[in-house]
């Protein structure tokens, strides 16, 4: 128990102060506490100074102090020193952390962390003067990195504690990557350039509650780089109020296109027949009607039905012959669309001003495809008159001929009154042939409805056959001339091959020119004609005369008849080049002998 005049020292760690209470138990005296240690607001590192605040004059003499009673006081002072050191170290770490978040000396707005506290560095006289004259409200705004809950709570506690320890620092920061212009040490302080910059920078309000870091003590290389202007904008969609940094020079490209106020007109079709509620195939090119609607239209118009409507059966020919709607035409090839619906040379089509009605067996594939093909060709041919078309109103028989045949009352408009399915076993070959023909017609169809693929292919094949026939006849003539020639010409195989390898077109004249397909009667007539000419001539020159030569058209295949035996050498009675009469020997096979001995490559 403490006696009179004894001093009990208690440690108040919450207020970071050491309080001395003088208690006089006997006399009931409790003196007001005296602070042994107080905060030094003018301290350079904003820490807690351990300066004694008990007046030296009030201190009791050394001889009046019981040192044994002050042991607890020394322990308390040691604990207080340790606590203040920890607090000062935490303050330094927190200050370095906040300075790393609030330095915008780099284009990215971040600076490398340092282990030194900038507040503990000494500054020159010029920097101190600049710091004292700089406006106190020129502070930066907070960034999104410092808005995390843990960092914010930690900084608020530190700020509350530091508000009791030291006032806010007057050091300002650089805002948005711009270097705040300092007072010109070599010129007039009233320069308009520096004044305007100071006024502009002083308008930035401080939203931070932390002690600001000290300015740099040396010139960085980033000061020499051109300034980057950043614009901070609070995100409207962000829940935590984060900021977005965007350079002012990089503007977002915005579209300046304008939508045309007047859109092109659309095709408005006034259908006269009612459609079905739930059609099997929906399309903007046609409307689906039921078999009952078609029957009622037949009964209403009677014989005038063909004058208003044209029914198009898109099935294969064997299906069409097995049963179709009265007055329907069979059209399953797409290359026949243009000649029927869009005739050329100004001829008026028999289908113009008539409404087409398409159908197939089920109206799922062939019928709708044919209707779309007609509309597509119509669009191409009337491209300059859009949206005009020649056949705006078109219909499709819903569920096709199968549905019409299934309705007993509608069978009266079928002709003949029967129905053959597409997959009927008796017409498998006709089905395969018609399907292949339909596919070829679709492949050769052009957007404008023309089909020249097959015709061009036929022309190429004809020219190829003519070239092969001419080449064969040329080779036959050269071989015969080489084998029957004497004197300077040799019959060796080398000379024959050498002549065949010559790519030049020879100047020889053949007795027959193969060009196209004809019958054998033309061959007989040509042979008789050549025999009559040769009887009036003394030599075979008339055979090779171009003016008197008769061009004979033979077939693609040359049939070599069985010639009768003839002497090895031509007799003097038989003129060279004269043909033997047909039918010699009692048979009707055309035969003849051609003597090519007088014909050479140099004949003119």
Swiss-Prot record:
Regions of compositional bias (Polar residues) in chain numbering? 44-54
- One biological process term in Gene Ontology: positive regulation of mitotic cell cycle
Q: Does the keyword Cell cycle apply?
A: yes
Q: List the disulfide bonds.
A: none
Q: Which GO-annotated molecular functions does the record name?
A: phosphoprotein phosphatase activity; protein tyrosine phosphatase activity
Q: What is its EC number?
A: 3.1.3.48
UniProtKB keywords: Cell cycle, Cell division, Hydrolase, Mitosis, Protein phosphatase
Q: Where is the Rhodanese domain?
A: 305-413
Short name of any one Pfam family annotated for the protein = Rhodanese
One cellular component term from this protein's GO annotations in UniProt = nucleus
Instruction: Give the domain of life.
Output: Eukaryota
Gene3D superfamilies according to UniProt: Rhodanese-like domain (3.40.250.10)
From the UniProt entry, list the residue stretches annotated as the region Disordered. Answer: 33-67, 127-188, 443-464, 562-588
User: Which principal EC class is assigned to this enzyme?
Assistant: hydrolase
* Catalytic activity, as annotated: O-phospho-L-tyrosyl-[protein] + H2O = L-tyrosyl-[protein] + phosphate
Q: Which PROSITE patterns match?
A: RHODANESE_3
List all Basic and acidic residues biased stretches: 127-138
- Protein family according to the UniProt entry: Belongs to the MPI phosphatase family.
Can you name this protein? M-phase inducer phosphatase cdc-25.1
Q: Which organism is it from?
A: Caenorhabditis elegans
